[in-house]
Amino acid sequence: MLGYSYLCRMNTFNKVLRSSLLLAVIVLVLFFGLYIAYSTNAQIQPKDYYKYTMIICCFILVPLFAGFSFFTTLSVSRAKAKIATTYEELLTFKDAFKIGFYTMFIAGVISLAVIFIFFNTSGEWAQDALRNGILDTFMGNMDAEQAKVIEQSRKEPEIMKVNLFSFKYFFGLLSMFLSFYMAVSAIFAQFLKKRVY
């Protein structure tokens, strides 16, 4: 029985790791695809680069992370239900939560770390484009008086040299993502616990 339990945990770990790595690769392909499109197409302005980045983050990555989490947890839940002989052997809330959370956490940390390392090494000009895109977006959505204040801030070196991809922002962004990962994992764990197929 001990060997069986060990094999089940290893199979679960392998599924989580495979899903996480695939998810991280998809995120990085989206990120570098947009970066390459921006760097090779002169018609894309910094404001558009920022806008496309936000669209990808909000409308593609959120459902992608949730979908990977759900289907990984569902896959493990079905596998456990198929071989379970008692009710106690079915997937528990705790195990389902771990599976969903680890799938998103591993992929999120890998992709976020690669993106932050990239922006701090060879992508500094893209960071400038994002910063200008943020300011252009703010200026486009404000009245003329506030837009002038933002335009003046572009001339201040301490504002324009703020590193958007420092450790401070990395951990701030990661903490926001962790709260999303926990909420999504809890919902899916509640839905998939002790499920029989």
Language-model segment annotations:
Residues 26-34, 64-68, 107-115, 180, ...:
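Alpha-helical transmembrane segments of multipass membrane proteins
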Residues 156-179:
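Individual transmembrane alpha-helix segments
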Residues 141-159:
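Low-complexity, acidic polar-rich segments
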Residues 10-13, 190-197:
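Short, charged juxtamembrane terminal tails flanking transmembrane helices
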Residues 96-119:
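C-terminal halves and exits of single transmembrane alpha-helices
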Residues 112-143:
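Functional transmembrane-helix hotspots
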Residues 80-104:
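Alpha-helical transmembrane segments with an aromatic anchor "belt"
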Residues 2-80:
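Transmembrane alpha-helical insertion/packing segments
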